[in-house]
Amino acid sequence: MLEQTRALESSATIKLVTSGRKSRLPHLVEVRFVASHGGIYVIGAGPRSDWVLNALATDRVKVRVGELAIPCRAQRATLQEVESTYGLFKKKYGNGIVSRWYGGSTLCLYLEFAGRAERRGAVVGESETKSDFDAWKASGRGYYDDVAAAFDSASEEYDFTISRNFVNTWIRRRSLEILARYMKKDDVALEIGCGTGAETLQIAKSVRRVVATDISDRMVSLLTAKLRARRTANVMPLKLGAAAIAQAAPYLYGGRASLVYSLNGALNCEPELDAFASGLERILSPGGYFVCSVRNTICLSEAVLHALLLQFGKSLPRLKQPTMVSVGGMDIPSTYYRPSDFASHFKRSFELKKIIALPAILPPAYLSGHYVRLTAVHKPLEVLERAVAGLPPFNRLGDQTLFVFRRFG
């Protein structure tokens, strides 16, 4: 309880996790709060806010703060509690913020602690790790077990985290735009590392069928729930690691895919890349496209930004591979690739058609906070990004590298 109190005292906001009233999917918002009377008080911006309605409908909610997840019961605060909460909010955040964001709102929720807080790693930026690969390797931990556990842990906050990051959303949009050039309406597509299915649901609108695979049980479960809520019938979620991808054959029409894709670095977490390439050879039809993006060992915009900030050592972790990355509050191993090294794993059966940086000029996602403050340069930089991302040498100097391969035959 002492740790819980300290975590709340040191935090300006909490993440409140509710369940959708119809979909039952996790719904996460970041809100201001005050801790008082053995619980937490939050003020709603309006009575029709989804998170407010969710909390009142389902009663049970979860509060994430620091490394803790705290189960709570939600109920409307009394008028007397509302008045008291406004006073505490003004003391904590100032009259200006309270007036601007909550002026006139009488909706206040009391979140009563309803069980023991669960400890989990704090969700931080991908590069904010506390361990190194040599120490992880010496621990004897199972590679796939750790990767699956990390993405299980990240699943509930995954969509929220991506949507709050400008560069991440730009990369997702750009990746789908490029992938669309290689899709046909009658394609049977196979996805490696589907996550919660944000890309899956978009792609399913444009192809005959998608078999969406991921190593994480919870990621697959979330996608399954989304499909049910949206009544999407042409997607098959499947728990499967990349190296075992040939096992997806029974779920594909004729045992083959005409398009395979893997976005946002899922293959950086697959240590058996040659085994994956062999499985891909068996499952992708001759003439079919394989489109993927992986983290790069050299990132031009990262190096420039760190140099401007006099942080000359911050780019070094990319140079030593494998490395550790933070996912869902856990450190897991990952391997970044020089574009030529990654492409060499597929040269036996695939023609390399394109290499595109994602992004070349914009910063990597974990430095998005610096970029969003420079609103005056957004448009010209994004125009420049599109102009140079596919041209040498810039196409090999991005945070991620997007590859387009075509199966021989």
Where are these regions (language model features)?
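Class I SAM-dependent methyltransferase SAM/SAH-binding core
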Residues: 196-245
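A short SAM/SAH-binding and catalytic strip from SAM-dependent methyltransferases
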Residues: 259-272
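A short glycine-rich, Lys/Arg-flanked "PGG" loop and its adjoining helix->strand segment in the class I
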Residues: 274-286
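Conserved class I S-adenosyl-L-methionine
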Residues: 121-184, 198, 202, 290-319
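A C-terminal cap/extension of S-adenosyl-L-methionine-dependent methyltransferases
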Residues: 344, 354-409
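Short, structured beta-strand-loop surface elements
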Residues: 46-117
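Acceptor-substrate binding/catalytic loop of class I
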Residues: 325-341
